[in-house]
Amino acid sequence: MRHEHYDERQTFVNYKLSHHALMILFVMLVANALVKSTFGLWAEPMAETIILILVPSIYYVTRSIFADAYMGRRDSVRKNVFWFLILAVLFIVPSFTLYGDPIFDSGLTDTAAPLLTGIFFLFIAAAHIASLWKKDDA
């Protein structure tokens, strides 16, 4: 994060939210260890890693977008939405055409990772659009 693009409030909010996301990650790692030791594998390693990364990331991105701390002074919402939609398409389309089933024997397979990542990018674009609507209503 380059500090010259963010004001003091945005920097403080980003630090606070990143601390929260880190705490969520710690709790999820402990919960993952308990689930794996009690019930066995619930997902293959790549899908498990993606889930453990995406949940705190979704928290951080959503809260920072709606707190107006995600983008710097020079960033454009439309440009961000465009690029996140492009990334979503680049991850989601191949996951349906090139890879196998994302769920097998009641567990996530490694082929779910690109699909989950694409959904994450789609979520970021939707959060940006929702924040624009929220600003227009205010």
Residue positions per predicted region:
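Generic alpha-helical transmembrane segments
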Residues: A47-S64, L87
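Membrane-interface helix termini and inter-helical loops of multi-pass transporters
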Residues: S37-W42, L98-L108
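N-terminal signal-anchor transmembrane alpha-helix
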Residues: M1-F39
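Hydrophobic alpha-helical transmembrane segments in multi-pass integral membrane proteins
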Residues: L29-N32, A88-I103
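Small-residue-rich segments of transmembrane alpha-helices in multi-pass membrane proteins
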Residues: K79-F91
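Short, charged juxtamembrane terminal tails flanking transmembrane helices
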Residues: W133-A138
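Canonical alpha-helical transmembrane segments
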Residues: S57-M71, A127-H128
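Hydrophobic residues within the alpha-helical transmembrane core of Major Facilitator Superfamily
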Residues: V27-A31, I58, A126
